[in-house]
């Protein structure tokens, strides 16, 4: 098994989605530099590949320093619930505080991961847009299969609602009602709802002093 390192590794590089421009060596260099500054960037849909990369980066940074905060920057349309929950569980597993920042677009599982950052350390840029909705899935097969899939979907929906309620201060009933259809939030509205703690415009408001020194700022 190849050990995790702070240098670039293919498993840690952003995944190009169909139709996207494939990552260049310059992109790989940027990803490595961000990782060296304890910044994890989720800039694609949430799937098994991107979740494995984010989980690996979180574990790596925690192994290097179990006390300094890690920043998770999110610009994602969402995606797989199970992949997103893997990231959430890893955030809970490590002793570090993981701050979150919405930049551009945080929808569905992107919104969920934004909301579950460390208390007091969940941020959004002024023009970020956040969208919440309930999990969905294609259901098919035999009657028995459909029943099993429906039960699993309901279980997952309840888990997401419970966790979101814990981190936003809203009730599970409110989360269920508001997520029944796509609901859009501005950065300020997300703050009022409890998804983020602050709307920020400066790096000084996001990065701890020790991290800024590491970046030479």
UniProtKB/Swiss-Prot annotation:
<dbReference type="GO" id="GO:0006515">
    <property type="term" value="P:protein quality control for misfolded or incompletely synthesized proteins"/>
</dbReference>
<comment type="function">
    <text>Cleaves peptides in various proteins in a process that requires ATP hydrolysis. Has a chymotrypsin-like activity. Plays a major role in the degradation of misfolded proteins.</text>
</comment>
<keyword id="KW-0378">Hydrolase</keyword>
<dbReference type="GO" id="GO:0005737">
    <property type="term" value="C:cytoplasm"/>
</dbReference>
<comment type="subunit">
    <text>Fourteen ClpP subunits assemble into 2 heptameric rings which stack back to back to give a disk-like structure with a central cavity, resembling the structure of eukaryotic proteasomes.</text>
</comment>
<protein>
    <recommendedName>
        <fullName>ATP-dependent Clp protease proteolytic subunit 1</fullName>
        <ecNumber>3.4.21.92</ecNumber>
    </recommendedName>
</protein>
<keyword id="KW-0645">Protease</keyword>
<feature type="active site" description="Nucleophile">
    <location>
        <position position="108"/>
    </location>
</feature>
<dbReference type="GO" id="GO:0051117">
    <property type="term" value="F:ATPase binding"/>
</dbReference>
<feature type="region of interest" description="Disordered">
    <location>
        <begin position="1"/>
        <end position="24"/>
    </location>
</feature>
<dbReference type="GO" id="GO:0004252">
    <property type="term" value="F:serine-type endopeptidase activity"/>
</dbReference>
<dbReference type="Pfam" id="PF00574">
    <property type="entry name" value="CLP_protease"/>
</dbReference>
<dbReference type="InterPro" id="IPR029045">
    <property type="entry name" value="ClpP/crotonase-like_dom_sf"/>
</dbReference>
<dbReference type="GO" id="GO:0009368">
    <property type="term" value="C:endopeptidase Clp complex"/>
</dbReference>
<comment type="similarity">
    <text>Belongs to the peptidase S14 family.</text>
</comment>
<keyword id="KW-0720">Serine protease</keyword>
<dbReference type="InterPro" id="IPR033135">
    <property type="entry name" value="ClpP_His_AS"/>
</dbReference>
<feature type="active site">
    <location>
        <position position="133"/>
    </location>
</feature>
<dbReference type="InterPro" id="IPR001907">
    <property type="entry name" value="ClpP"/>
</dbReference>
<dbReference type="GO" id="GO:0004176">
    <property type="term" value="F:ATP-dependent peptidase activity"/>
</dbReference>
<keyword id="KW-0963">Cytoplasm</keyword>
<dbReference type="InterPro" id="IPR023562">
    <property type="entry name" value="ClpP/TepA"/>
</dbReference>
């Amino acid at each position: 098994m190849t050990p995790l390192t702070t240098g670039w590794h293919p498993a840690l590089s952003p995944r190009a989605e169909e139709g996207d421009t494939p990552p260049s060596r310059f992109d790989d260099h940027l990803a490595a530099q961000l990782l060296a500054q304890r910044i994890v960037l989720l800039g694609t849909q949430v799937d098994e590949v991107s979740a494995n990369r984010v989980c690996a980066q979180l574990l790596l940074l925690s192994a290097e320093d179990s006390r300094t905060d890690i920043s998770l920057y999110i610009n994602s349309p969402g995606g797989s619930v199970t992949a997103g929950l893997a990231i959430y569980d890893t955030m809970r597993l490590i002793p570090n505080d993981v701050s979150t920042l919405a930049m551009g677009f945080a929808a569905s599982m992107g919104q969920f991961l934004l909301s579950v950052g460390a208390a007091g350390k969940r941020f959004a840029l002024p023009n970020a847009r956040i969208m919440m909705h309930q999990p969905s899935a294609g259901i098919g097969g035999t009657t028995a299969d459909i029943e099993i899939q429906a039960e699993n979907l309901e279980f997952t929906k309840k888990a997401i609602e419970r966790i979101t309620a814990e981190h936003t201060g809203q009730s599970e009933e409110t989360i269920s009602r508001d997520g029944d259809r796509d609901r859009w939030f501005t950065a300020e509205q997300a703050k009022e709802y409890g998804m983020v703690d602050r709307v920020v415009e400066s790096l000084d408001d996001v990065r701890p002093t020790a991290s800024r020194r590491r970046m030479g700022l």
